[in-house]
């Protein structure tokens, strides 16, 4: 039973970290609120996530980020900042999720969380210019909304169905990897076209 609980916590942690790669603030807010409502139990070291000041700050930043990422002029700036925020969020979520049910060393948990969230965030950051260039910026709000929705679904699955959340993260990383490859090819083709133009 203890092994099953530990595996479940680790799989759920991957789900939360993947969600953080898409939206760094949403899973932090959701986990803090879930702990506050007694739906989940975080280790004593992560009780600050469910404190009133933390929930207020996370909620405000989440709303600002949610709006800002829909604006083409701001999304690139937010993605640049997210290069540091997303891995940090993933590290916190992974260690918080595994703190009670797993014997995974905190340092290892933090590294796994940071890598998972960072990889997802890096892929969407590389792919976003491709979306902007092929849709003249019109597709950015739609893609951003899809990312937020996926982050929410992943967060819920991570807390309720960890195994499914882990599978979704794997599929997501493959899909983002393919989109990143397409974005790089598009950027190279555009660069060659620009060089060849008189």
Positions of PLM-derived features:
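Helix-coil boundary and interhelical linker segments in multi-pass alpha-helical membrane proteins
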Residues: 1-8, 34-52, 93-109, 158-166
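The first (N-terminal) embedded transmembrane alpha-helix
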Residues: 9-11, 17-34
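C-terminal ends of transmembrane helices
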Residues: 62-75, 125-132
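Small-residue-rich segments of transmembrane alpha-helices in multi-pass membrane proteins
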Residues: 83-95, 139-153
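Helical membrane-embedded segments and adjacent short helical loop/helix-boundary regions
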Residues: 20-25, 47-58, 82-86
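A cytosolic-side transmembrane-helix exit/cap motif
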Residues: 45-53, 98-106, 125-136, 184-197
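Mid-bilayer segments of alpha-helical transmembrane spans in multi-pass integral membrane proteins
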Residues: 88-97, 106-127, 149
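Cytoplasmic-side transmembrane-helix entry/capping segments in multi-pass membrane proteins
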Residues: 75-88, 107-110, 135, 141
